[in-house]
Protein backbone atom coordinates (compact mmCIF):
# COMPACT_ATOMS: atom_id res chain seq x y z
CA UNK A 1 0.00 0.00 0.00
CA UNK A 2 2.68 2.50 0.98
CA UNK A 3 4.56 2.04 -2.31
CA UNK A 4 1.46 2.96 -4.28
CA UNK A 5 0.80 5.88 -1.96
CA UNK A 6 4.32 7.23 -2.48
CA UNK A 7 3.93 7.01 -6.25
CA UNK A 8 0.59 8.78 -6.10
CA UNK A 9 1.78 11.60 -3.84
CA UNK A 10 5.01 12.12 -5.80
CA UNK A 11 2.90 12.62 -8.93
CA UNK A 12 1.02 15.39 -7.14
CA UNK A 13 -2.18 13.46 -6.44
CA UNK A 14 -3.97 13.50 -3.10
CA UNK A 15 -4.79 10.40 -1.06
CA UNK A 16 -8.38 9.75 -0.07
CA UNK A 17 -9.18 9.47 3.63
CA UNK A 18 -9.44 5.69 3.22
CA UNK A 19 -6.08 5.47 1.43
CA UNK A 20 -4.38 7.61 4.06
CA UNK A 21 -5.87 5.44 6.79
CA UNK A 22 -4.65 2.25 5.13
CA UNK A 23 -1.13 3.66 4.83
CA UNK A 24 -1.16 4.78 8.46
CA UNK A 25 -2.33 1.31 9.50
CA UNK A 26 0.65 -0.22 7.68
CA UNK A 27 3.06 2.24 9.29
CA UNK A 28 1.64 1.80 12.81
CA UNK A 29 1.90 -1.99 12.53
CA UNK A 30 5.55 -1.90 11.49
CA UNK A 31 4.86 -2.87 7.89
CA UNK A 32 6.72 0.03 6.28
CA UNK A 33 10.47 0.53 6.14
CA UNK A 34 12.12 3.70 7.49
CA UNK A 35 13.01 4.71 3.92
CA UNK A 36 9.39 4.31 2.80
CA UNK A 37 8.10 6.32 5.74
CA UNK A 38 10.61 9.11 5.15
CA UNK A 39 9.80 9.18 1.43
CA UNK A 40 6.06 9.41 2.02
CA UNK A 41 6.32 12.12 4.67
CA UNK A 42 8.65 14.21 2.52
CA UNK A 43 6.46 13.85 -0.56
CA UNK A 44 3.35 14.78 1.41
CA UNK A 45 5.06 17.83 2.84
CA UNK A 46 6.10 19.02 -0.64
CA UNK A 47 2.63 18.39 -2.07
CA UNK A 48 0.80 19.78 0.94
CA UNK A 49 -1.40 17.66 3.19
CA UNK A 50 -5.19 17.72 2.75
CA UNK A 51 -8.09 17.45 5.17
CA UNK A 52 -8.78 13.92 3.88
CA UNK A 53 -5.19 12.81 4.43
CA UNK A 54 -4.87 14.30 7.91
CA UNK A 55 -8.24 12.85 8.93
CA UNK A 56 -7.27 9.38 7.71
CA UNK A 57 -3.96 9.49 9.55
CA UNK A 58 -5.53 10.84 12.75
CA UNK A 59 -8.38 8.34 12.79
CA UNK A 60 -6.00 5.37 12.68
CA UNK A 61 -3.60 6.94 15.17
CA UNK A 62 -6.52 7.32 17.58
CA UNK A 63 -7.42 3.66 17.11
CA UNK A 64 -3.83 2.57 17.76
CA UNK A 65 -3.43 4.64 20.93
CA UNK A 66 -3.74 3.21 24.42
CA UNK A 67 -7.28 4.29 25.18
CA UNK A 68 -8.00 6.12 28.43
CA UNK A 69 -11.52 5.66 29.79
CA UNK A 70 -13.35 8.36 31.73
CA UNK A 71 -16.60 8.72 33.64
CA UNK A 72 -16.94 12.31 32.47
CA UNK A 73 -19.33 12.99 29.57
CA UNK A 74 -17.31 16.05 28.55
CA UNK A 75 -13.52 16.26 28.47
CA UNK A 76 -11.52 19.31 27.43
CA UNK A 77 -8.03 19.25 25.93
CA UNK A 78 -5.85 22.34 25.46
CA UNK A 79 -3.09 20.76 23.39
CA UNK A 80 -1.56 22.80 20.55
CA UNK A 81 0.78 22.00 17.70
CA UNK A 82 3.73 23.99 19.03
CA UNK A 83 6.26 25.03 16.44
CA UNK A 84 5.51 28.75 16.49
CA UNK A 85 9.09 29.55 17.52
CA UNK A 86 7.92 32.35 19.81
CA UNK A 87 9.44 30.99 23.03
CA UNK A 88 6.45 31.88 25.22
CA UNK A 89 5.73 30.31 28.58
CA UNK A 90 3.35 27.32 28.63
CA UNK A 91 0.11 29.23 28.16
CA UNK A 92 -2.18 26.30 27.33
CA UNK A 93 -0.89 24.29 30.31
CA UNK A 94 -1.64 27.13 32.72
CA UNK A 95 -5.04 27.57 31.06
CA UNK A 96 -5.79 23.88 31.64
CA UNK A 97 -5.65 24.39 35.42
CA UNK A 98 -7.96 27.38 35.15
CA UNK A 99 -10.48 25.31 33.19
CA UNK A 100 -10.23 22.37 35.61
CA UNK A 101 -10.43 24.72 38.59
CA UNK A 102 -13.77 25.92 37.25
CA UNK A 103 -15.09 22.37 37.38
CA UNK A 104 -14.63 21.24 33.79
CA UNK A 105 -12.72 17.92 33.47
CA UNK A 106 -9.47 18.26 31.53
CA UNK A 107 -7.49 15.53 29.75
CA UNK A 108 -4.32 17.43 28.89
CA UNK A 109 -2.46 15.67 26.09
CA UNK A 110 1.19 16.59 25.66
CA UNK A 111 4.84 15.76 25.45
CA UNK A 112 8.28 16.96 26.36
CA UNK A 113 9.88 19.78 24.44
CA UNK A 114 10.00 19.19 20.69
CA UNK A 115 10.11 22.64 19.11
CA UNK A 116 10.65 24.80 22.19
CA UNK A 117 12.75 24.94 25.33
CA UNK A 118 9.92 23.64 27.48
CA UNK A 119 7.08 21.25 26.67
CA UNK A 120 3.98 20.67 28.78
CA UNK A 121 5.46 17.55 30.39
CA UNK A 122 8.61 19.48 31.32
CA UNK A 123 6.76 22.31 33.05
CA UNK A 124 4.35 19.96 34.82
CA UNK A 125 7.24 17.99 36.28
CA UNK A 126 8.76 21.22 37.55
CA UNK A 127 5.43 22.04 39.17
CA UNK A 128 5.57 18.66 40.93
CA UNK A 129 3.17 16.67 38.77
CA UNK A 130 4.18 13.12 37.97
CA UNK A 131 3.73 12.45 34.25
CA UNK A 132 5.04 8.88 33.79
CA UNK A 133 1.75 7.14 34.62
CA UNK A 134 0.28 4.03 33.04
CA UNK A 135 -3.24 3.94 31.64
CA UNK A 136 -4.91 2.75 34.84
CA UNK A 137 -3.27 5.50 36.88
CA UNK A 138 -4.23 8.15 34.32
CA UNK A 139 -7.84 6.92 34.38
CA UNK A 140 -7.93 7.02 38.17
CA UNK A 141 -6.43 10.50 38.17
CA UNK A 142 -8.90 11.77 35.59
CA UNK A 143 -11.90 10.32 37.42
CA UNK A 144 -10.82 11.31 40.94
CA UNK A 145 -9.18 14.70 40.35
CA UNK A 146 -11.06 15.79 37.26
CA UNK A 147 -7.78 16.46 35.50
CA UNK A 148 -4.97 14.29 34.16
CA UNK A 149 -1.92 14.59 31.97
CA UNK A 150 -1.78 12.17 29.05
CA UNK A 151 1.90 11.71 28.21
CA UNK A 152 2.00 11.06 24.48
CA UNK A 153 5.05 8.71 24.30
CA UNK A 154 3.46 6.29 26.79
CA UNK A 155 0.02 6.25 25.16
CA UNK A 156 1.06 6.25 21.50
CA UNK A 157 3.50 3.33 21.45
CA UNK A 158 3.06 2.74 17.72
CA UNK A 159 4.62 6.13 17.06
CA UNK A 160 7.96 4.47 17.70
CA UNK A 161 7.96 3.31 14.08
CA UNK A 162 8.13 6.88 12.78
CA UNK A 163 10.50 8.38 15.34
CA UNK A 164 13.67 7.46 13.43
CA UNK A 165 12.54 8.63 9.98
CA UNK A 166 11.20 11.90 11.41
CA UNK A 167 14.44 12.57 13.20
CA UNK A 168 16.59 11.73 10.20
CA UNK A 169 14.76 13.86 7.63
CA UNK A 170 14.59 16.76 10.08
CA UNK A 171 11.64 18.60 8.52
CA UNK A 172 8.16 19.40 9.74
CA UNK A 173 5.72 16.68 8.64
CA UNK A 174 2.10 15.70 9.12
CA UNK A 175 3.09 14.10 12.43
CA UNK A 176 3.80 17.55 13.86
CA UNK A 177 0.07 18.26 13.78
CA UNK A 178 -1.36 14.84 14.65
CA UNK A 179 -0.74 15.05 18.40
CA UNK A 180 -3.55 17.50 19.21
CA UNK A 181 -5.92 15.49 16.99
CA UNK A 182 -5.35 12.17 18.76
CA UNK A 183 -6.16 12.57 22.46
CA UNK A 184 -6.15 9.03 23.95
CA UNK A 185 -9.07 9.89 26.23
CA UNK A 186 -11.15 10.95 23.24
CA UNK A 187 -11.58 14.53 24.48
CA UNK A 188 -14.73 15.85 22.84
CA UNK A 189 -14.05 19.54 23.50
CA UNK A 190 -10.83 21.25 22.51
CA UNK A 191 -8.84 24.44 22.24
CA UNK A 192 -6.23 23.71 19.60
CA UNK A 193 -3.56 26.28 18.79
CA UNK A 194 -1.78 26.06 15.42
CA UNK A 195 1.53 27.53 14.26
CA UNK A 196 0.23 28.59 10.84
CA UNK A 197 -2.88 30.56 9.84
CA UNK A 198 -3.29 28.15 6.93
CA UNK A 199 -3.81 25.27 9.35
CA UNK A 200 -6.58 26.82 11.42
CA UNK A 201 -9.55 26.10 9.20
CA UNK A 202 -8.02 22.87 7.91
CA UNK A 203 -7.62 21.33 11.38
CA UNK A 204 -11.03 22.62 12.41
CA UNK A 205 -12.50 20.63 9.53
CA UNK A 206 -10.51 17.57 10.63
CA UNK A 207 -11.86 17.85 14.19
CA UNK A 208 -15.38 18.12 12.83
CA UNK A 209 -14.84 14.96 10.76
CA UNK A 210 -13.46 13.15 13.80
CA UNK A 211 -16.62 13.90 15.77
CA UNK A 212 -15.38 16.48 18.28
CA UNK A 213 -18.48 18.15 19.73
CA UNK A 214 -17.14 21.66 20.29
CA UNK A 215 -13.73 23.12 19.59
CA UNK A 216 -11.84 26.29 18.85
CA UNK A 217 -8.82 26.16 16.56
CA UNK A 218 -6.77 29.32 16.95
CA UNK A 219 -3.79 31.12 15.48
CA UNK A 220 -2.73 34.13 17.47
CA UNK A 221 -1.60 37.54 16.30
CA UNK A 222 2.18 37.64 16.20
CA UNK A 223 2.31 34.03 15.01
CA UNK A 224 1.43 32.26 18.28
CA UNK A 225 -0.24 28.88 18.51
CA UNK A 226 -2.46 30.44 21.20
CA UNK A 227 -4.85 33.38 21.39
CA UNK A 228 -2.49 36.32 21.90
CA UNK A 229 -2.66 39.95 23.01
CA UNK A 230 -0.76 41.32 20.02
CA UNK A 231 -3.93 41.90 18.00
CA UNK A 232 -6.92 39.97 16.62
CA UNK A 233 -6.41 36.21 16.45
CA UNK A 234 -7.85 33.77 13.92
CA UNK A 235 -10.60 31.71 15.53
CA UNK A 236 -12.27 28.73 13.85
CA UNK A 237 -15.17 27.32 15.83
CA UNK A 238 -16.27 23.70 15.45
CA UNK A 239 -19.86 23.05 16.49
CA UNK A 240 -22.25 20.28 15.53
CA UNK A 241 -20.08 19.21 12.62
CA UNK A 242 -19.79 22.65 11.06
CA UNK A 243 -16.91 25.13 11.02
CA UNK A 244 -17.16 28.90 11.34
CA UNK A 245 -14.12 31.14 10.85
CA UNK A 246 -13.74 34.53 12.50
CA UNK A 247 -11.49 36.77 14.56
CA UNK A 248 -11.12 37.24 18.30
CA UNK A 249 -10.01 40.74 19.24
CA UNK A 250 -8.88 40.96 22.88
CA UNK A 251 -9.60 44.70 22.89
CA UNK A 252 -13.29 43.92 22.43
CA UNK A 253 -13.26 42.30 25.87
CA UNK A 254 -11.34 45.08 27.59
CA UNK A 255 -7.81 43.71 27.30
CA UNK A 256 -4.88 45.89 26.32
CA UNK A 257 -2.77 44.89 23.36
CA UNK A 258 0.69 43.65 24.30
CA UNK A 259 3.61 42.40 22.20
CA UNK A 260 4.43 38.70 22.13
CA UNK A 261 7.71 39.48 23.90
CA UNK A 262 5.92 40.09 27.22
CA UNK A 263 4.84 36.44 27.17
CA UNK A 264 8.41 35.15 26.90
CA UNK A 265 9.27 31.99 28.76
CA UNK A 266 12.50 30.17 29.40
CA UNK A 267 13.59 26.96 31.06
CA UNK A 268 11.09 24.52 32.57
CA UNK A 269 11.85 25.94 36.01
CA UNK A 270 11.27 29.51 34.83
CA UNK A 271 8.05 28.57 33.07
CA UNK A 272 6.79 26.70 36.12
CA UNK A 273 7.42 29.79 38.25
CA UNK A 274 5.49 31.94 35.77
CA UNK A 275 2.54 29.54 35.72
CA UNK A 276 2.44 29.32 39.51
CA UNK A 277 2.44 33.10 39.90
CA UNK A 278 -0.48 33.38 37.47
CA UNK A 279 -2.47 30.66 39.24
CA UNK A 280 -1.76 32.36 42.57
CA UNK A 281 -3.28 35.59 41.28
CA UNK A 282 -0.50 37.71 39.79
CA UNK A 283 -1.98 40.24 37.37
CA UNK A 284 -0.72 41.51 34.04
CA UNK A 285 -0.47 40.47 30.41
CA UNK A 286 0.53 36.90 31.24
CA UNK A 287 -2.60 36.38 33.32
CA UNK A 288 -4.70 38.04 30.62
CA UNK A 289 -3.55 35.65 27.90
CA UNK A 290 -4.16 32.62 30.13
CA UNK A 291 -7.67 33.85 30.99
CA UNK A 292 -8.44 34.41 27.30
CA UNK A 293 -7.37 30.91 26.32
CA UNK A 294 -9.07 29.33 29.33
CA UNK A 295 -12.31 31.12 28.42
CA UNK A 296 -12.39 29.25 25.12
CA UNK A 297 -11.92 25.97 26.96
CA UNK A 298 -14.85 26.81 29.23
CA UNK A 299 -17.08 27.58 26.25
CA UNK A 300 -15.99 24.41 24.46
CA UNK A 301 -16.64 22.39 27.62
CA UNK A 302 -20.12 23.82 28.04
CA UNK A 303 -19.43 25.69 31.28
CA UNK A 304 -19.84 29.11 29.66
CA UNK A 305 -22.42 30.21 27.10
CA UNK A 306 -20.06 32.60 25.36
CA UNK A 307 -16.56 34.04 25.54
CA UNK A 308 -17.55 36.96 27.78
CA UNK A 309 -19.02 34.58 30.36
CA UNK A 310 -16.00 32.31 29.94
CA UNK A 311 -13.71 35.20 30.82
CA UNK A 312 -15.65 35.85 34.03
CA UNK A 313 -15.55 32.20 35.06
CA UNK A 314 -11.84 31.90 34.21
CA UNK A 315 -10.98 34.97 36.29
CA UNK A 316 -13.03 33.60 39.19
CA UNK A 317 -11.25 30.25 38.95
CA UNK A 318 -7.97 32.05 39.60
CA UNK A 319 -9.16 34.66 42.11
CA UNK A 320 -11.07 32.12 44.22
CA UNK A 321 -7.97 29.94 44.52
CA UNK A 322 -9.64 27.02 42.74
CA UNK A 323 -7.14 26.93 39.87
CA UNK A 324 -4.07 26.70 42.07
CA UNK A 325 -5.93 24.26 44.34
CA UNK A 326 -6.45 22.01 41.30
CA UNK A 327 -2.71 22.10 40.65
CA UNK A 328 -1.97 21.13 44.25
CA UNK A 329 -4.56 18.36 44.12
CA UNK A 330 -2.98 16.95 40.96
CA UNK A 331 0.51 17.14 42.49
CA UNK A 332 -0.66 15.35 45.65
CA UNK A 333 -2.62 12.67 43.82
CA UNK A 334 0.11 11.75 41.34
CA UNK A 335 2.74 11.90 44.06
CA UNK A 336 0.85 9.37 46.18
CA UNK A 337 0.58 6.77 43.43
CA UNK A 338 2.58 3.62 44.04
CA UNK A 339 5.64 2.79 41.96
CA UNK A 340 3.67 0.05 40.23
CA UNK A 341 1.38 2.62 38.71
CA UNK A 342 4.18 4.42 36.92
CA UNK A 343 4.94 3.32 33.40
CA UNK A 344 8.35 1.95 32.59
CA UNK A 345 10.33 4.58 30.71
From Swiss-Prot:
InterPro entries: Anthranilate_Pribosyl_Tfrase, Glycosyl_Trfase_fam3, Glycosyl_Trfase_fam3_N_dom, Glycosyl_Trfase_fam3_N_dom_sf, Nuc_phospho_transferase. Its cofactor is Mg(2+). Anthranilate 2 binds at residue 166. GO terms for cellular component: cytosol. Anthranilate 1 binds at residues 80, 111. One of its GO terms (biological process) is L-tryptophan biosynthetic process. Mg(2+) 1 binds at residues 92, 226. Binds 2 magnesium ions per monomer. The keyword Secreted does not apply. SUPFAM superfamilies: Nucleoside phosphorylase/phosphoribosyltransferase catalytic domain (SSF52418), Nucleoside phosphorylase/phosphoribosyltransferase N-terminal domain (SSF47648). Pfam families: Glycos_trans_3N, Glycos_transf_3. Its EC number is 2.4.2.18. Pathway: Amino-acid biosynthesis; L-tryptophan biosynthesis; L-tryptophan from chorismate: step 2/5. It catalyses: N-(5-phospho-beta-D-ribosyl)anthranilate + diphosphate = 5-phospho-alpha-D-ribose 1-diphosphate + anthranilate. Mg(2+) 2 binds at residues 225-226. GO terms for molecular function: anthranilate phosphoribosyltransferase activity; magnesium ion binding. Keywords: Amino-acid biosynthesis, Aromatic amino acid biosynthesis, Glycosyltransferase, Magnesium, Metal-binding, Transferase, Tryptophan biosynthesis. 5-phospho-alpha-D-ribose 1-diphosphate binds at residues 80, 83-84, 88, 90-93, 108-116, 120. Homodimer. NCBIfam families: trpD. Belongs to the anthranilate phosphoribosyltransferase family. Catalyzes the transfer of the phosphoribosyl group of 5-phosphorylribose-1-pyrophosphate (PRPP) to anthranilate to yield N-(5'-phosphoribosyl)-anthranilate (PRA). This is Anthranilate phosphoribosyltransferase. It comes from Pelotomaculum thermopropionicum (strain DSM 13744 / JCM 10971 / SI). The gene is trpD.
Amino acid sequence: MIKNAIKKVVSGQHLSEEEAGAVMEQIMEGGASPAQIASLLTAMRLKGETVDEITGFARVMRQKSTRVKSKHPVLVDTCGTGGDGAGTFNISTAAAFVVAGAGVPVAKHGNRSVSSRCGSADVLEELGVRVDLDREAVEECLNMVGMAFLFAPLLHRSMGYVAGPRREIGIRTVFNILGPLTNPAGANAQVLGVYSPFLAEMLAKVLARLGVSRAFVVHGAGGLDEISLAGPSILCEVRNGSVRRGLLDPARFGFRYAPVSVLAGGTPRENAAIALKILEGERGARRDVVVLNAALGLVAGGKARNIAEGLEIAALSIDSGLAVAKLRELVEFTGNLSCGEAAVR
